[in-house]
Amino acid sequence: MRRAALWLWLCALALRLQPVLPQIVTVNVPPEDQDGSGDDSDNFSGSGTGALPDITLSRQASPTLKDVWLLTATPTAPEPTSRDAQATTTSILPAAEKPGEGEPVLTAEVDPGFTARDKESEVTTRPRETTQLLITHWVSTARATTAQAPVTSHPHRDVQPGLHETSAPTAPGQPDQQPPSGGTSVIKEVAEDGATNQLPTGEGSGEQDFTFETSGENTAVAAVEPDQRNQPPVDEGATGASQGLLDRKEVLGGVIAGGLVGLIFAVCLVGFMLYRMKKKDEGSYSLEEPKQANGGAYQKPTKQEEFYA
């Protein structure tokens, strides 16, 4: 065990003492001028500020490779404790979140004072903390969902203003209280009224949490409106004026008197026409005594006088 720890320490020290060689990458590379004559200098930017400075980028080797190598080399020890550590790491790491690119999986610093057992204990304790965080997060989400339950069921209880609630909403930690003897009937009535007052799916928003109250007067008006739409339009001004004239007594009396006079005149006219038709059948249209048939003929005198010669 001591030999393995010594070899690990020497390898880590050798990796740390290696110099980091920066890789210089030249970014400012001017394009090839094929149209020009070649006399002009290509070191200018064209904006009048002078020559372009050379920009270099340096890359440093990340120290994560040696840490991963140390962790993979740790389970090679012959003691059973290293196997236990390997089993714990392999069973817990898949449950944790996947690391991003370039991020170390498990960071472990190597110091001269640490031994292999200290490294194993550090490796085994860190994944356990991640599992505890996952458990607390799951409990917090469960509490949030239970707290939202009374809020979603609250609009169904306000369907009718006449019905009063019999039980208050319970907290997430408290058990559900049983309603009194009349509680079940009240809940059933509210559910039935809510089902009848809900809007159809084609007109509403598609959610059953929102309900609207409708009274008997509104339904009666809705039933009468289609009948009124089918009737032809009526001039309201003319009907109002005629009703106003008929309400007056003078106008009503004049209308009745005119009707009676017209009736009498019609009867007289019909009687006169009948009388003329009767006279026509008799052959005389005059109302005087009839004349003689011979007209102006000479008539012998009835008295005769005697003459002597």
From Swiss-Prot:
Matches recorded under InterPro entries: Neurexin-like, Syndecan, Syndecan/Neurexin_dom, Syndecan_CS
Modified residues (Phosphoserine): 284
Membrane topology value: Single-pass type I membrane protein
Any Pfam family hit: Syndecan
Residue stretches of biased makeup (Low complexity): 173-183
GO cellular component assignments: external side of plasma membrane; extracellular region
Residues that span the membrane, as ranges: 254-274
PROSITE patterns the record matches: SYNDECAN (PS00964)
Site (Cleavage): 241-242
Chain segments carrying region Disordered: 28-57, 145-185, 283-309
Record field: compositional bias (Acidic residues): 32-42
GO annotation, biological process: canonical Wnt signaling pathway; cell migration; myoblast development; positive regulation of exosomal secretion; positive regulation of extracellular exosome assembly; receptor-mediated endocytosis; striated muscle cell development
Glycosylated position list: 37, 43, 45, 47, 205, 215
Post-translational modification: Shedding is enhanced by a number of factors such as heparanase, thrombin or EGF. Also by stress and wound healing. PMA-mediated shedding is inhibited by TIMP3.
Segments on the Extracellular face: 23-253
Signal sequence segment: 1-22
Family (UniProt): Belongs to the syndecan proteoglycan family.
Physiological role: Cell surface proteoglycan that contains both heparan sulfate and chondroitin sulfate and that links the cytoskeleton to the interstitial matrix. Regulates exosome biogenesis in concert with SDCBP and PDCD6IP. Able to induce its own expression in dental mesenchymal cells and also in the neighboring dental epithelial cells via an MSX1-mediated pathway.
Self-association and partners: Interacts with CDCP1. Interacts (via C-terminus) with TIAM1 (via PDZ domain). Interacts with MDK.
Protein name as catalogued: Syndecan-1
UniProt organism field: Mesocricetus auratus (Golden hamster)
